[in-house]
Amino acid sequence: MMDKNAPRGTRTGFTTGACSAAAARAATLGLVTGQVPDRIECLLPNGDLVTFSVLDGAVNGDTAHAMVIKDAGDDPDCTDKAHLTADVTLRRDLPGQVLLTGGFGVGTVTMPGLGLTVGGPAINPVPRRNITANVQAAAGELLDEAGFEVCISVPQGVEMARKTLNARLGILGGISILGTTGIVKPYSTAAYRASVVQGVQVAGTLGHGVVVLTTGGRTEKFVMAEMPHLPEPAFVQMGDFLRYAMSAAVKAGLKQVVIGGMVGKLTKIAQGETITHAGRAEVDTGLLADIAAGLGAAPEVCEAIRQNETARYAGERMDALGLGTAFHTALAQRVIQTLQARYPDKFDLKVLVCDFDGRKIAEAP
């Protein structure tokens, strides 16, 4: 559980994905034992075991119900206090399987470009795997003779989704179930901004003259594998706070800055945004369409990229044309041009681009 006594501005929270996994695990355990527990230990995607409080536990024949309330810590977004609810049904016709569906308040994917099945629930891949793993852990030997259908719902999800960009992304009818680690760090707090600056300062004292800035845990793991010669303190998770990280790099006198990221955040940087939080700025798909046009993509492809709301869609369209590497390299070059204009003659810049599985797809220069 979270430390309620942590200093203000530093308390971490849990993602909608982690809370969904905890609710699903509790409900599954209810089917195994006949009673849903009021506390459940849940394995997070980052490997941590965390205990969650469980509410509304009930078992009715082959179906069990459980709910976990999201606590976002000191980074409360519009899904803070959401009731992540799991209804788990024993499926004797599906031995060994875990079937995941979305109920009321969980959005439905209606457009490509998100890495999710069109027509399916907006439950991202990492939470999907995490929910499945926790159900399997709770089910134990019962999986040998039956499967489990897990329906995740969020009673306040429709209302909460109005405060997100989901509708513009083609996710309709509710929120998305998100989270790559299970933990919500206080990215929007002054304390986290201070930790970014401090991290860059530490990198400056190492004597290597380089700092590697990443937008999150997956991209940090990716660039660490690409640059194994650097010590761990040279890598700083800047989150959405590019502005603070770059200013700290200038002040520290660092001679090289490496930025590792995925296409969405890098597009925002290329378009001149220095705070890249989803709520602060939208992806300029016109910029991506222009890059595609410069590489010879057909006008109808460029227009489709321009009209779509995600950078991922642009990358997938260009991949399909065999121009994915060239497209992502051009985007990385645009990031360098934008930052060199903002910080002229301050440091050498390198940009590494990874896909959503943490694999390298491009770099510049």
From Swiss-Prot:
Q: Could you tell me which pathway this protein works in?
A: Cofactor biosynthesis; adenosylcobalamin biosynthesis; cob(II)yrinate a,c-diamide from sirohydrochlorin (anaerobic route): step 6/10
EC number of this enzyme = 2.1.1.195
Record's keyword terms, sorted? Cobalamin biosynthesis, Methyltransferase, S-adenosyl-L-methionine, Transferase
InterPro entries, alphabetically? CbiD, CbiD_sf
Q: Name one GO biological process term.
A: methylation
- Record has Transferase as a keyword: yes
One GO molecular function term of this record is:
cobalt-precorrin-5B C1-methyltransferase activity
What reaction is this protein's catalytic activity?
A: Co-precorrin-5B + S-adenosyl-L-methionine = Co-precorrin-6A + S-adenosyl-L-homocysteine
EC primary class: transferase
UniProt xrefs under HAMAP family:
CbiD
- Family classification: Belongs to the CbiD family.
Protein name per the record: Cobalt-precorrin-5B C(1)-methyltransferase
Q: What organism, scientifically named, is this protein from? A: Polaromonas naphthalenivorans (strain CJ2)
